[in-house]
């Protein structure tokens, strides 16, 4: 189904219906409006901003022809050049110090992670060993119980065979009463 132009001119592009201007008063409302706009057309790719580049100072010049000092007279252009070079060098040194401090903290963090992981593995191994020891103890107790039961059964069977001979003698006797009758 084709959308009709209001002007009915073939070369004229369609205008979108104007939406009321909504001004967000709070950050939450602003975020809600952005989400609503994104969800109107879910097939369209959402703009994801890339991480901004980290600031790097300009590399120091490899060769400086005429080195100027701070003794340049006030009002001369040389003093301003010296001052800017000095400021840039201080910035570079501060950046390198911060970078080395960050690397040092990262290394300490990684070492601490490894140390904590090793301690956790040691605790786990110790507990595992304790569990295995308890399990072995239970198995040994169970085996000992089974063996003692077997010994008792064998003693009963040997005593029952001896008592069977006695029972045969008892069987010869006639019972004086009959069970189950009143």
Swiss-Prot record:
Residue span of region Required for nuclear localization: 126-138
Region of interest (Disordered), residue spans: 1-80, 114-182
Residue stretches of biased makeup (Basic and acidic residues): 1-18, 27-43, 114-124, 144-156
Presence of the UniProt keyword Hydrolase in the record: no
Pfam families for this protein: DUF1168 (PF06658)
Segments of this protein annotated with the region Required for RNA-binding: 51-143
Coiled coil segments of this chain: 99-157
Compartments, record wording: Nucleus; Nucleus, Nucleolus
Top-level taxon of the source organism: Eukaryota
Gene Ontology molecular function, alphabetical: double-stranded RNA binding; protein kinase binding; protein kinase inhibitor activity
Basic residues composition bias: residue spans: 125-143
InterPro entries, per the entry: Prkrip1
Biased composition (Acidic residues): 164-173
Keywords per UniProt: Coiled coil, mRNA processing, mRNA splicing, Nucleus, Spliceosome
Subunit structure: Component of the pre-catalytic and post-catalytic spliceosome complexes.
Function in brief: Required for pre-mRNA splicing as component of the spliceosome. Binds double-stranded RNA.
PANTHER family associated with the record: PRKR-INTERACTING PROTEIN 1
Family note: Belongs to the PRKRIP1 family.
Stated name of the protein: PRKR-interacting protein 1 homolog
Species in which this protein is naturally found: Danio rerio (Zebrafish)
Taxonomy of the source species: Eukaryota, Metazoa, Chordata, Craniata, Vertebrata
């Amino acid at each position: 189904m084709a959308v009709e132009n209001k002007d009915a001119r073939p070369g004229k592009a369609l205008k979108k219906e104007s939406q009321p201007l909504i001004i967000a008063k709070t950050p939450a409302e602003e975020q809600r409006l952005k989400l609503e706009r994104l969800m109107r057309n879910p097939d369209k790719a959402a703009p994801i901003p890339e991480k901004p580049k980290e600031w790097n100072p300009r590399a120091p010049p490899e060769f400086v022809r005429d080195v100027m000092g701070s003794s340049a007279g006030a009002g001369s252009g040389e003093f301003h050049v010296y001052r800017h070079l000095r400021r840039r060098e201080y910035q570079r040194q501060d950046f390198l110090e911060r970078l080395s401090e960050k690397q040092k903290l990262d290394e300490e963090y990684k070492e601490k992670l490894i140390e904590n992981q090793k301690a956790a593995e040691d605790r786990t191994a110790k507990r595992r060993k304790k569990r295995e020891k308890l399990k072995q103890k239970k198995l040994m107790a169970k085996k000992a119980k089974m063996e003692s039961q077997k010994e008792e059964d064998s003693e009963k069977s040997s005593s029952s065979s001896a008592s069977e001979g006695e029972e045969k003698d008892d069987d010869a006797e006639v019972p004086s009463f009959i069970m189950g009758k009143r």
